[in-house]
């Protein structure tokens, strides 16, 4: 397991990353990761309820799907949070079938509560959360013929969620782009800058091999402030 403790946006954050340990099933691997995460967070006076974002990695589609089901169980109720998931065999250093990245936040105000916004109707991913003035959106995707088509669909939806949360692209502090390996980062950047003029302080890029369903070419995660 990797653990990083840092301050950002006037809050305390804990980033945890781990691959599954040998288990009877992928679901059991994922369950074990969340148990380990919860123990780490408890040692810092936090719990899974402080989760604001999780990113799930599967070795293949079946692993992603089973891991996603287990994550929905582990991060339910007060632990519900922004999420994304990917298929990416080269992400793994072990023989694990599933890996997880989790970001937990210690709010500056002890009485701060998460505001959870669902899609209508609700689906597996949360639309976004607001926690002590921090806005965290789940990864946003689309199934359309080309990357250009998908970006033209995704970016206005992100803008709508930011506006609904009391934020905007101008208040975005981080954007993560998880691009299908068949696509070029240069093309992605051109498409993004064509539609979004705001200067985002942190922008990170990954190549992945698959998503929650076939036909997706990009998933974008955004964090902002209100």
Regions found by a protein language model. Give the residues of each.
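N-terminal presequence-like segments and the immediate start of the first folded domain
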Residues: 1-173, 179-226
């Amino acid at each position: 397991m990797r653990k990083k403790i840092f301050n950002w946006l006037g809050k305390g954050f804990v980033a945890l990353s781990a691959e599954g340990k040998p288990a009877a099933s992928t679901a059991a691997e994922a369950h074990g990761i969340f148990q380990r995460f919860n123990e780490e967070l408890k040692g810092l006076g936090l719990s899974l309820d402080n989760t604001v974002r999780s990113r799930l990695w599967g070795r293949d589609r079946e692993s992603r799907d089973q891991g996603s089901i287990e994550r929905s169980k582990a991060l339910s109720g007060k632990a519900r949070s922004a999420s994304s998931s990917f298929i990416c065999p080269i992400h793994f250093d072990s023989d694990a079938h599933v890996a997880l990245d989790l970001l937990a936040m210690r709010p500056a105000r002890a009485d701060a509560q998460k505001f959870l916004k669902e899609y209508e109707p609700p689906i597996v991913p949360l639309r976004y959360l607001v926690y002590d003035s921090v806005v965290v959106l789940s990864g946003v995707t689309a199934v359309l013929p080309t990357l250009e088509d998908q970006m033209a669909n995704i970016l206005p939806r992100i803008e709508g969620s930011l506006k609904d949360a009391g934020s905007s692209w101008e208040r975005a502090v981080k954007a993560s782009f998880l691009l299908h390996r068949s696509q070029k980062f240069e093309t992605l950047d051109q498409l993004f800058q064509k539609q979004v003029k705001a200067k985002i302080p942190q922008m990170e890029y990954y190549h992945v091999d698959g998503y929650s369903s076939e036909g997706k070419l990009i998933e974008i995660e955004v964090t902002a402030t209100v």
